[in-house]
């Protein structure tokens, strides 16, 4: 069986032999980040921007479905018809959308 001193020396030497691999790996990932990841993010941003430009800004036609926007009792805040996080540009009331939409 090997002595503890020889085991420690063997560990130090084996660790030193692998020291050169770490720098190459970091360099590889750095290159991959600049060559693949950044252009990929740029393509995704361009795609999202083009989709946003094509998006229709007209509101959908309001249809008063009987199973939606049921009010059995008033909300305890405001006029009782608007939910706590009501957004007049996105959320319809039982009567329809509020005012002009953009």
Swiss-Prot record:
Membrane topology, Mitochondrial matrix segments: 15-25
Topological category with respect to the lipid bilayer: Single-pass membrane protein
Annotated protein name in UniProt: Cytochrome c oxidase subunit 6A, mitochondrial
Its job: Component of the cytochrome c oxidase, the last enzyme in the mitochondrial electron transport chain which drives oxidative phosphorylation. The respiratory chain contains 3 multisubunit complexes succinate dehydrogenase (complex II, CII), ubiquinol-cytochrome c oxidoreductase (cytochrome b-c1 complex, complex III, CIII) and cytochrome c oxidase (complex IV, CIV), that cooperate to transfer electrons derived from NADH and succinate to molecular oxygen, creating an electrochemical gradient over the inner membrane that drives transmembrane transport and the ATP synthase.
Pathway: Energy metabolism; oxidative phosphorylation
Mitochondrial intermembrane topological domain residue ranges: 51-102
Domain of life: Eukaryota
Record: transit peptide: 1-13
Keywords associated with the record: Membrane, Mitochondrion, Mitochondrion inner membrane, Oxidoreductase, Transit peptide, Transmembrane, Transmembrane helix
Organism: Oncorhynchus mykiss
């Amino acid at each position: 069986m090997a002595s503890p001193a020889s085991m420690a020396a063997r560990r130090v030497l084996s660790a030193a032999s692998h020291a050169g691999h770490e720098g190459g790996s970091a360099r590889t990932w750095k290159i991959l980040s600049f060559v693949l990841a950044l252009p990929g993010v740029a393509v995704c941003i361009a795609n999202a921007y083009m989709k946003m430009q094509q998006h229709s800004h007209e509101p959908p036609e309001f249809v008063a479905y009987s199973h939606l926007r049921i009010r059995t009792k008033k909300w305890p805040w405001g006029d009782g018809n608007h939910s706590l996080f009501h957004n007049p540009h996105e959320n319809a009331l039982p009567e329809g959308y509020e005012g002009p939409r953009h």
